[in-house]
């Protein structure tokens, strides 16, 4: 049974796996296709158009990385001769990085201006009979490719982080009076971090990725869930939200939250998000981000309990720094949003954001397990049990 469901899910995802960067012809095509499928499920469908300009934000991030590269190289150079100044430079670097990497209302303001890129959020809704609760099932519909493959991006990010740590250690060793013979440490670490930051700053995006794992598999999973959840209690409003421009710093999620702010305040809302769901491997729950911040403690508890009862192995992970998912702006508005993903380090994961991210990388059995677990978690949410 699970295998049959999995085959159907992969086939559904395959029809949605084509290059569809925001604003492209593929983007318009997937918006039309998802609208038609939601209508076929008997939902009231709205296509909420919006436009945005990403260039100013990209310039800020690029120049911040380049400035940070220069600063960390300088700090590394000073680590042996002037460790105090080296440490001060690292403090400045960490503060600047923290300001940009930490989500905040002022940062969201950078994304609210209209611009040349036009896309849409696709929303399917089954209204509640009266005031009650709102359940949101969410997945982003856009895809993108990047000039650096995932292993290279991971390597550059790790190189930047470890390089900064290396500069701090080098300066600390000198301050402790044990720097003899280790003058190379700070310089080497600074150069490694600087080169890594320059590589990240030079990275560009394109429209070559079919987005199989990221995120056609998740679209198919949400459509399957919407079909299964036809019989919810009359006081539960079901919202299926396919966001645009997630790959462009979650602009679509922010626009939807802004547009529906008043109604979100009037009714308790919770969200299950699906991103990268369908890659072969264990089911993954993205539960935390930043410094100890939980995305959805109540939804997490319900889902973990359901997984335990079903015997479904899961792995809970923390969202890596500088990585964005639609759950972040939801959490910052006080809306619990638990993200389902899956996978392990392998071909399917390494192909994300490249032309190799095809539907053939999806694993039907994994997708079926995610659907079953999410459905069980929804029923626990409906019953109000942890």
Label each PLM-derived region with a short phrase.
Residues 38, 124, 137-138, 143, ...:
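Alpha-helical metal-binding/catalytic segments enriched in His/Glu/Asp
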Residues 152-154, 233, 245-345, 349:
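Metal-dependent peptidase/peptidase-like ectodomains
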Residues 1-29, 41, 203-207, 276-279, ...:
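N-terminal capping segment at the start of a domain
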Residues 8-11, 29, 33, 224, ...:
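Extracytoplasmic/secreted proteins, especially bacterial periplasmic and envelope-associated proteins
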Residues 1-2, 24-27, 104-134, 207-211, ...:
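N-terminal signal-anchor transmembrane helix
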């Amino acid at each position: 049974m699970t295998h049959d469901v999995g085959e159907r899910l992969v086939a559904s995802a395959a029809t949605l796996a084509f290059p569809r960067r925001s604003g492209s012809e593929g983007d318009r095509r997937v918006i039309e296709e998802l609208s038609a499928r939601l209508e076929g499920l008997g939902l009231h469908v709205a296509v909420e158009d919006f436009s945005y300009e990403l260039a100013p934000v990209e310039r800020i991030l690029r120049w911040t990385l380049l400035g940070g590269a220069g600063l960390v190289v300088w700090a590394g150079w000073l680590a042996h001769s002037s460790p105090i100044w080296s440490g001060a430079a690292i403090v400045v670097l960490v503060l600047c990085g923290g300001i940009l990497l930490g989500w905040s209302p002022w940062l969201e303001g950078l994304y609210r201006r209209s611009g040349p890129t036009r896309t849409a959020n696709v929303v399917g809704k089954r209204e509640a009979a009266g005031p009650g609760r709102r359940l949101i099932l969410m997945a982003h519909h856009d895809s993108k490719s990047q000039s650096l493959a995932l292993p290279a991006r991971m390597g550059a990010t790790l190189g930047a982080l470890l390089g900064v740590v290396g500069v701090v250690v080098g300066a600390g060793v000198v301050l402790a009076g044990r720097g003899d013979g280790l003058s190379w440490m700070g310089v080497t670490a600074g150069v490694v971090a600087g080169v890594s930051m320059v590589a990240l700053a030079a990275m560009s995006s394109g429209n070559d990725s079919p987005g199989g794992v990221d995120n056609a598999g998740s679209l198919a999973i949400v459509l399957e869930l919407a079909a299964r959840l036809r019989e919810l209690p009359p006081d539960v409003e079901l919202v299926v939200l396919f966001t645009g421009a997630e790959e462009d710093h979650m602009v679509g999620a922010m626009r939807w939250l802004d547009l529906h702010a008043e109604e979100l305040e009037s009714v308790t809302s919770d969200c299950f998000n699906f991103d990268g769901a369908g890659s072969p491997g264990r089911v993954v729950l993205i539960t935390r981000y930043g410094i100890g911040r939980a995305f959805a403690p109540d939804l997490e508890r319900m889902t973990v309990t359901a997984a335990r009862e079903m015997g479904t192995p899961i792995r809970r992970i923390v969202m890596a720094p500088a990585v964005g998912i639609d759950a972040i702006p939801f959490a910052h508005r006080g809306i619990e949003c638990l993200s389902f993903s899956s996978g392990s380090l392998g071909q399917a994961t390494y192909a994300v954001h490249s032309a190799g991210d095809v539907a053939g990388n999806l694993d039907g059995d994994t997708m079926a397990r995610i659907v079953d677990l999410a459905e069980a978690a929804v029923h626990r949410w409906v019953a109000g049990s942890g």
